[in-house]
Amino acid sequence: MYDIKKWKHVFKLDPAKTISDEDLDKICMSETDAIIIGGTDNVTEDNVIQLMSRVRRYPLPLVLEISNLESTMPGFDFYFAPMVLNSRDVTYHNGILLEALKEYGHMMDFDEVIFQGYVVLNPDSKVAEKTQANTDIDTQDIEAYALMTDKVYRFPIMYIEYSGTFGDMEKVRAAKDNLEEAHIFYGGGISSISDAKAAAGVADTIVVGNLVYNDIKQALKTVKIKGKS
């Protein structure tokens, strides 16, 4: 079994977006620690299967971020189940999970299901709109969400999502300082190696997504944050 707490860098691929075989090969052979498949819009059974089958040729961990029931399927090493803590809609806190458990609970391997305390912080992002996230939160709120993740729910991961813009690293640090057991993931707006280094200086794991499609060369450079130390 893979140890998620050793991951420093992961690429997130959107099944609704197009990526060439050449670029996918570069991503999967880049020494990233894992690939996450997930997105906000138009995530379907067909496009998840297609992308999964292409990535499965490579010997690295493959994760499905659960966004809807239709596209949830066997064949992944892990399933990330985001509990959007600052959502105003219970659907994105435990509603999707409830439906998944009703449908697949009898066959789930819960060692593969990783629950995340997920906090969305970019008010202009699609994910904030879809989940009805309250993004108007301060450092004290972030600290409380960290305690909620770590001490109340005891989720193994807190995921801070700025989706589309580079975030406030002081808020990420405030969350990190209030976690004892949970591992912190950061995603959002990483568009250069300098952004990647700044995020990696605070978060345990950085997630690089849109940059794969916007500038593959810059995306590949972000793997350098792993270093050789």
Curated annotation (Swiss-Prot):
Catalysis performed (reactions): sn-glycerol 1-phosphate + all-trans-heptaprenyl diphosphate = 3-heptaprenyl-sn-glycero-1-phosphate + diphosphate
Record Pfam families: PcrB
EC number(s) from the headed UniProt entry: 2.5.1.n9
Pathway participation: Membrane lipid metabolism; glycerophospholipid metabolism
A single BP term in Gene Ontology: glycerophospholipid biosynthetic process
InterPro entries recorded: GGGP/HepGP_synthase_I, GGGP/HepGP_synthase_sf, GGGP_HepGP_synthase
Binding residue positions for sn-glycerol 1-phosphate: K12, Y159, I160, E161, Y162, S163, G164, G189, G209, N210
Recorded GO MF terms: heptaprenylglyceryl phosphate synthase activity; magnesium ion binding
Amino acids binding Mg(2+): D14, T40
SS bonds (residue pairs): none
Cofactors, names only: Mg(2+)
Keyword terms, alphabetized: Lipid biosynthesis, Lipid metabolism, Magnesium, Metal-binding, Phospholipid biosynthesis, Phospholipid metabolism, Transferase
UniProt record similarity statement: Belongs to the GGGP/HepGP synthase family. Group I subfamily.
PANTHER family xref list: HEPTAPRENYLGLYCERYL PHOSPHATE SYNTHASE, PTHR40029
Subunit structure: Homodimer.
Function: Prenyltransferase that catalyzes in vivo the transfer of the heptaprenyl moiety of heptaprenyl pyrophosphate (HepPP; 35 carbon atoms) to the C3 hydroxyl of sn-glycerol-1-phosphate (G1P), producing heptaprenylglyceryl phosphate (HepGP). This reaction is an ether-bond-formation step in the biosynthesis of archaea-type G1P-based membrane lipids found in Bacillales.
Entry protein name: Heptaprenylglyceryl phosphate synthase
Organism: Staphylococcus carnosus (strain TM300)
